[in-house]
Design a protein with these regions (language model features):
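Left-handed beta-helix
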Residues: 1-3, 206-363
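Conserved N-terminal catalytic core of the sugar/cofactor nucleotidyltransferase
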Residues: 1-9, 17-27, 32-113, 117-125, ...
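Short beta-strand segments
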Residues: 9-11, 59, 110-113, 142-146, ...
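Residue-level signal for inorganic ion chemistry
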Residues: 40, 96, 115, 157, ...
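A residue-level structural signature of the nucleotidyltransferase/glycosyltransferase Rossmann-like core
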Residues: 57, 109, 175, 201-202, ...
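General beta-strand structural signal in soluble alpha/beta enzymes
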Residues: 58, 82, 111, 142-145, ...
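Conserved core of the sugar-phosphate nucleotidyltransferase
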Residues: 121-243, 264, 341
Length: 363
């Protein structure tokens, strides 16, 4: 039933908002910040029972292939698809489609990420089974997250008319995708019960999404066709190198989903999802101690400290806090970050500043 169902894990990002732990040599998906395994390993682990390793594809950049394959050698190395340059998630989808249509013309793919936290693996597999069934109706499918609070850091999806029940789950036509809202708007959307968070996980038949790319992004489609024509011969890498830089960067949401002819959303019931988009979002996903503090690593000493996230580098660096609250303290060995949790999103500004200053050793 699922022999034509493939998981495509996007694993090429760097996660600049988790600096100073996330760096060029150790991107976000290779961090051990939620247990003993990396985020990438957890992303593969949770697919067990639905996708054999032979049907798990990984899209990443060339200098991360060896690292990721080393973390999960059971995935065949030929299943790693190399993205020559960052050109947005729409082009990643297109490249994965090219690879899969040569392997299995009847393929259905689940677009997943390597750097999210999901606590309820069984529910994810239920959602994916339901999405696979819906996708056979030649529609595009996205997974929605039932909001637990009025988040301003996520996009929202407005549910429309019911589409049907699949695998015991309700599905809905999508009325519209909405940008990350201001807090007042987020409160209204959460209260009305008609909106879910956009998880960034998508399921569709390869031919269906390629049809949407051809209709909405004809320039990208033409370039993908050139790449496809060379995919199985010795000119593949040269063609990729020549064509890929000419692709205009675009996201899945803007490039494909917002104007697609029909999109169906499946709201999660209790997925335990977090996109780990910042130190603050990681803090929100982990239970703290009696004082609300979370220690990811190390053995700090805390006096009169509340609501603080601490990650030490080693036993040689002792972190001591006195009379503070709502801080993020990260020691990576060569850099220390101290910031108010409310300003966690601004860590990306630090990375941009370091780039402008040419301080490559800290990137």
């Amino acid at each position: 039933m699922y022999e034509n169902f493939y998981a495509v894990i996007m694993a090429g990002g760097s996660g600049t908002r988790l600096w100073p732990l996330s760096r060029k040599h150790q991107p976000k998906q290779s961090l051990r910040i939620a247990g003993d395994r990396t985020l990438f390993q957890y992303a593969v682990d949770r697919l067990e029972g639905l996708f054999p390793h032979e049907r798990i594809m990984v899209v990443t950049v060339a200098d991360q292939v060896d690292m990721l394959h080393g973390e999960y050698p059971e995935i065949p190395v030929e299943n790693f698809i190399i993205e020559p340059l960052p050109r947005g998630t729409a082009s990643v989808v297109g490249l994965a489609c090219v690879a899969l249509k040569h392997r299995d013309p009847n393929a259905t793919m689940a677009i997943l990420t390597a750097d999210h936290l999901i606590r309820n693996d069984a529910h994810l597999r239920q959602l994916l089974r339901a999405a696979h069934a819906v996708a056979q109706e030649d529609v595009l499918v996205t997974l929605g997250i039932t909001p637990s609070y009025p988040a301003t850091g996520y996009g929202y999806i407005q549910k429309g008319e019911p589409f049907g029940d699949y695998e015991g789950l309700e599905t809905f036509d999508v009325n519209r995708f909405k940008e990350k809202p201001r807090e007042a708007q987020a409160q209204v959307m959460v209260a009305d019960g008609q909106h879910v968070w956009n998880s960034g996980m998508f399921i569709w038949r390869v031919d269906a999404v390629m049809g949407e790319i051809e209709r909405q992004m004809p320039d990208l489609y033409d370039k993908l066709e050139k790449i496809s024509d060379a995919w199985l011969d010795e000119t593949k890498m040269d063609t990729l190198a020549n064509v890929w830089p000419m692709i205009d960067p675009q996201t899945i949401d803007y490039g494909i989903m917002e104007q697609a002819q029909q999109v169906v959303v499946i709201p999660s019931v209790d997925l335990g999802w977090n996109d780990v988009g910042s130190w603050e979002s990681l803090f929100e996903s982990i239970d703290g101690d009696a004082a609300g503090n979370i220690v990811l690593r190390g053995d700090p000493i805390t006096f009169d400290t509340q609501g603080t996230l601490i990650c030490g580098d080693s036993s040689e660096h002792l972190i001591v806090t006195i009379g503070v609250e709502d801080l993020i303290i990260i020691d990576s060995g060569d850099a220390i970050l101290v910031c108010d949790r409310k300003h966690a999103q601004r860590v990306r500004d630090v990375v941009n500043y370091l780039k402008k200053q040419g301080r490559e050793d800290y990137l």
